[in-house]
Amino acid sequence: MELPSHKTKIIATIGPASKQKETIKKMIKAGMSVARINFSHGTLEEHAKTIETVRDVAEKLERRVAILGDLPGLKMRVGKIKGDSVTLRKGDKVVLTTRDIEGDETTIPVEFKDLPKLVSKGDTIYLSDGYIMLRVEEVRENEVECVVVNGGILFSHKGINIPKANLPIEAITPRDFEIIEFAIEHGVDAIGLSFVGSVYDVLKVKSFLEKKSADLFVIAKIERPDAVRNFDEILNAADGIMIARGDLGVEMPIEKLPIMQKQLIKKTNLAAKPVITATQMLVSMTTERIPKRAEVTDVANAILDGTDAVMLSEETAIGKYPVESVEMMAKIAKTTEEYRESLGYSRLRAWIDSLPKRSTIKEAITRSVIDALCAIDIKYILTPTRTGLTPRLISRFKPKQWILAFSSSERVCNNLAFSYGVYPFCMDENFNEKDIIMLVKGLGIVKEDDTVLLTEGRPIGKTVGTNTMRIFQIP
């Protein structure tokens, strides 16, 4: 078998433009590692069919594709629009109404009854991740009359942002918990928690999953100033982080976003947890076959910052070129990774070495792995794992070698789909080193006399963490 051309993981949102079996097949072949289901749109019946299609296609292609379910959260959204979209032009008057109607260019329904209580004359309201800007002219009992300051095309169920508004609702809603139950039932691998404000939002979901005896990977989406302020505690509780730049760039000064992204990626790397950079990465490809030069640079810089994964949203959900968007992301990743060595794990190693010396044996071993990679021409890193931690500890250094991870847990293997440079293999229970070598040789990944590095826990057969590193040539 042939490993992917790039190590950065690509998450693609499945929607009306990409839910067809043939399109999903092409996206997987192009490099999609994770299929994202956005539960803010569509019905659960539609999502169940999409999940089934992704699983079926991935199995036939013999590819491992994880499924991420993105929860709606507390986000205010516009309602249903006639024809699914409307063009709002600068200077137009438009009314936001809490009435349950179908919207048009003059009246837009909102799915939040308390909207009139949150705004006053002169306030700014943003729609569709800040692309459209409205100024409040008059507030009535169930309506807000506005003038369009920045126009654009508004689609059904797009988000509403009111900077500095205090939303009187929980971050994780009752509807979210219903969707989590659906996700458990349908074998979704990970859930994205929208509009997390504090560690308690993460812990509440973790507690719910524990009661359901479910071990879904919990990814906290950072899209509110509160989440940035409480980031360290959120990072400690979550399994992974998504930097959701659309809402974050509206809720805080946009000029602070680039540095904030770098800081959050660095912290998540240090914690050895996967970090996803999301929103508007190749957004021009929603309608154009070739992305903007600035978008290509944005993707490359996120990869150089240390992101594990990059995410496509409307580009693949509703765009004209879903397959081409994945292909472009893969091309950018491949080219950028070739230049990482001068900026990559040496910098992260310096950061880690500057931390207080509280390393575990496993962490010390993974640091030694990086030293060995710098000294010897090693082809692959082989990491048997029960929890996925050892591959992630190595992955944070972003080495140029593939990390081949082996686990008897299907869930662990799917969760590793979010980590940079990790290619997971699901093994039978009680597999050993001989089984690993037979597998990778049989697949044609390694050849006789290739030098590989193996991490393992000794004594073999005992439930112990990684405590040993060996370098040897494939017999």
Swiss-Prot record:
PROSITE patterns: PYRUVATE_KINASE
Residues the record lists as binding Mg(2+): E223, D247
Catalytic activity as recorded in UniProt: pyruvate + ATP = phosphoenolpyruvate + ADP + H(+)
Keyword field: ATP-binding, Glycolysis, Kinase, Magnesium, Metal-binding, Nucleotide-binding, Potassium, Pyruvate, Transferase
Pathway: Carbohydrate degradation; glycolysis; pyruvate from D-glyceraldehyde 3-phosphate: step 5/5
Top-rank taxon: Archaea
Names of required cofactors: a divalent metal cation
Entry binding sites for ATP: N38, F39, S40, H41, R77, K158
Annotated residues for binding of K(+): N38, S40, D70
Site features described as Transition state stabilizer, chain residue numbers: K221
Binding, substrate: R36, G246, D247, T279
EC number: 2.7.1.40
Major enzyme class: transferase
Record GO terms (molecular function): ATP binding; kinase activity; magnesium ion binding; potassium ion binding; pyruvate kinase activity
Quaternary structure and interacting proteins, as annotated: Homotetramer.
Entry's family note: Belongs to the pyruvate kinase family.
Protein name: Pyruvate kinase
Organism whose genome encodes this protein: Thermococcus litoralis (strain ATCC 51850 / DSM 5473 / JCM 8560 / NS-C)
Source organism phylogeny: Archaea, Methanobacteriati, Methanobacteriota, Thermococci, Thermococcales
Encoding gene, per UniProt annotation: pki
